[in-house]
Amino acid sequence: PAMWSSAEFWMQRLKKDTRVKDGTWVCPNEWSPEHGPTEDGVAHAQQLVRANLQICRDAINELSAAELGLTPADVEQLDNYLDHIDTGLHTEAYDGTTWKQQADQRNIKKGDLLLREWKYSDFTRGQGPNHRHMSHLMCLFPLNQVRPGDGGYYDAAVRSLRFRGDVATGWSMGWKANLWARAKDGDHARVILNNALRHSTTYGVDEGQGGIYYNLYDSHAPFQIDGNFGMCSGIAQMLLQSQDNIIEILPALPSVWKNGHVTGLKAVGNFTVDITWVNGKPTATRIVSHKGAPLVVKSDKDLTTVYVHVGQKNLEVVPTATQGAYELKDVPAGATVEIEFTKPAGLGALKAAAPAASKAVYDLSGRRVSESAHGLQIVGGHKVLR
């Protein structure tokens, strides 16, 4: 009810674009907190309202309109707004002159595309290249509206993040750590983490002295719990992401975190994930499926070549259309999946050959071989390593 009431409010409040006249629904008289002019169609509002409408549609797909007490007319209205709402995703080219010193330092060149913060006003209406608010990047985090290969919006969002710099305090540090993790730049996310762990030198209201106090409370200043929660989330995002219903292992691992182990990370689909890594590469991953949802795992290693199992049972691993992502088939609720990156596929189920075995021995092509031959063979219908 709360989700639908929110959607109804916005479907009544949205208006047709009267400036560009592109047929889209825009949020009227909005602001990009806490930054710049007030106007229709601001990216921050558009991205949030679009997400609200989409979440309602997802709930209908999952539970059915009838179960939610909605009529076919309600669903038709929602679909119409979803089809025509301004996405809040527009780009503009850097002009090569505004805030040029910071642009040069941050590798922003003339003609580079930035994500627009305002639909009608350009980036120069902002309050400078170091403003700590990143309101037009809701699409990157916490939402999931841009991704690599989407026609340039993801790259423009990451470039806008880089152009804004690392100056931040409190919750803004937490947000930037998450944004850089979503940008798959673990080293930059760690820079923000280091800044957040710098000791604050004031207990008054001085936003230029952000960091932490001796009790590890976040200093905005003063204390602000959002910074603590945000940095914890950012660390989790460096180690695991699942926003596309794909569990991605170590997506933004800082290069200096060479060896490590983490337990209890949660992933979309009600999974709990433990990861061990050595020299920046995963060596073992343990995934508990609490719901029995489809399980897709992304890794920089071909999962069809490593040992993936539930107990002693090998799992079928099938490549998906997403590069580097593999579906692990038929994982029931309550099962614990083990991925052992240092073992070849199937080895865990092999049986030791009996010393006096006299059964016929075959290679994996079905050709009979000598009983004294070595390697992976078939003996008595079982795979055997001799």
How would you describe each model-predicted region?
Residues 1-5, 22-30, 156, 191-195, ...:
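Beta-strand segments within the central parallel beta-sheet cores of soluble alpha/beta enzyme folds
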Residues 1, 43-50, 54-62, 70-246, ...:
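Active-site core of glycosidic bond-cleaving carbohydrate-active enzymes
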Residues 308-322, 338, 343-386:
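C-terminal outer-membrane/trafficking sorting elements
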Residues 17-20, 33-36, 179, 185-186, ...:
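Flexible loop/turn segments at secondary-structure boundaries
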Residues 14-34, 95-106, 216-217, 249-262:
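Short, surface-exposed recognition loops and adjoining beta-strand edges that mediate ligand/DNA contacts
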Residues 5-63:
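Acidic/histidine-rich catalytic neighborhood
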Residues 187-343:
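Non-catalytic C-terminal accessory modules of carbohydrate-active enzymes
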